[in-house]
Amino acid sequence: MNIRPLHDRVIIKREEVETRSAGGIVLTGSAATKSTRAKVLAVGKGRILENGTVQPLDVKVGDIVIFNDGYGVKSEKIDGEEVLIISENDILAIVE
């Protein structure tokens, strides 16, 4: 992937969601919800603080994160893959 996010932006790829229920029923439409887990593909250099210093991000490439899938999440196709560009503020947790 040939893209570098700026500042506190993070590029993530959403994890695939199981499309079958525990009972084996295939889920479609609104029943098949999108995952809010994703793998971090790239990170910016950090948030620029009021005093001009750069605060590094807490997430790093390869982390699995849980994110807020709402306003401010930008979807793009890069190298044929759908990725999301989000602010680090939209990341709720790192899965360890």
Swiss-Prot record:
Biological process annotations from GO: chaperone cofactor-dependent protein refolding
Major subcellular location class: cytoplasm
Residues annotated as transmembrane: none
Key words of the record: Chaperone, Cytoplasm, Stress response
Pfam families: Cpn10 (PF00166)
Positions of disulphide bridges: none
Localization in the cell: Cytoplasm
Superkingdom to which the source organism belongs: Bacteria
Cellular component per GO, a single term: cytoplasm
GO molecular function, one term: protein folding chaperone
PANTHER family linked to this entry: 10 KDA HEAT SHOCK PROTEIN, CO-CHAPERONIN GROES
Family in the record: Belongs to the GroES chaperonin family.
Subunit structure: Heptamer of 7 subunits arranged in a ring. Interacts with the chaperonin GroEL.
Record's function text: Together with the chaperonin GroEL, plays an essential role in assisting protein folding. The GroEL-GroES system forms a nano-cage that allows encapsulation of the non-native substrate proteins and provides a physical environment optimized to promote and accelerate protein folding. GroES binds to the apical surface of the GroEL ring, thereby capping the opening of the GroEL channel.
Protein name (record): Co-chaperonin GroES
Naturally occurring in which organism (per UniProt): Haemophilus influenzae (strain ATCC 51907 / DSM 11121 / KW20 / Rd)
